[in-house]
Curated annotation (Swiss-Prot):
PROSITE patterns membership: RECA_1, RECA_2, RECA_3
A GO MF term: damaged DNA binding
Name of the protein described by the UniProt record: Protein RecA
Organism annotation: Pectobacterium carotovorum subsp. carotovorum (strain PC1)
Region named Disordered: 333-357
Amino acid sequence: MAIDENKQKALAAALGQIEKQFGKGSIMRLGEDRSMDVETISTGSLSLDIALGAGGLPMGRIVEIYGPESSGKTTLTLQVIAAAQREGKTCAFIDAEHALDPIYAKKLGVDIDNLLCSQPDTGEQALEICDALTRSGAVDVIIVDSVAALTPKAEIEGEIGDSHMGLAARMMSQAMRKLAGNLKQANTLLIFINQIRMKIGVMFGNPETTTGGNALKFYASVRLDIRRTGAIKEGEEVVGSETRVKVVKNKVAAPFKQAEFQILYGEGINIHGELVDLGVKHKLIEKAGAWYSYNGDKIGQGKANACNFLKENPAVAAELDKKLREMLLHKGNELTPATAGNSHDEDAFADEGNEEF
């Protein structure tokens, strides 16, 4: 439908005035927005990148990762940092829990010499540091570990037992309003790690909730629920954990998918195991009995040996990773259980309770 010529002139004048006052790009037609193609950073897990639909976590957005204790939350964020650093990006870790282990971070591939780290005294200080780093435009990824440890100044200065109802939620709400726009402008990814609490007196539905009020749930473009589902054993020794991550909220692709992978103690996400499993599923790796073959060449007898081959031959692993990403991610948000490997859809209604945390 054609717009009246007078209206077109009035609209052009209004747009010109807005751009003059607020700067070029302050208003535009949606189809002209070059930022529609979202830049992403890998999570370090191929199946999780596929479940996210966009190939990783979106830059310029807020992400929340929550789960029970020892479920792999910090490990996952350290893998994100390692992936970002490999791309030459600058990363910062706001360690509000004062529990970051640099030796473990180094084992996961993090360049600790170039990782910015802060251990703030108060929640307000932590969030101000986040804002200052974002406004600098020089930091690409910021991790806050964790929301539960962001203690308001009034609570720290008060006595144990004093009531501070709603202080943390109000602090987070103010911070979200301030940070969201700055993150978009700077194209900085901000990841909040969060803990789980139980609602008292819930008879029906999910009694679990996350700390810090509701603001983070609304402002987050992606929310990931990470759970430990089992143990990995070598004989009697536990060497890792089976992990499931559910995409509870996703503003950049289809939500409610989930990914399953292994976290090995001292090594992090077992990416080579994922490559073997997904390669076999999508017929890039041939499996005959116990033998695995790639491009006609045998790479190992048994999954463990096939994984070791990929670990010792990073060029082959990178080639296989590239082929799988091209095959699975180009299907975009229409990924189905048959095409997503370890990633599969969840019933949106079944997960509605999680979304309402």
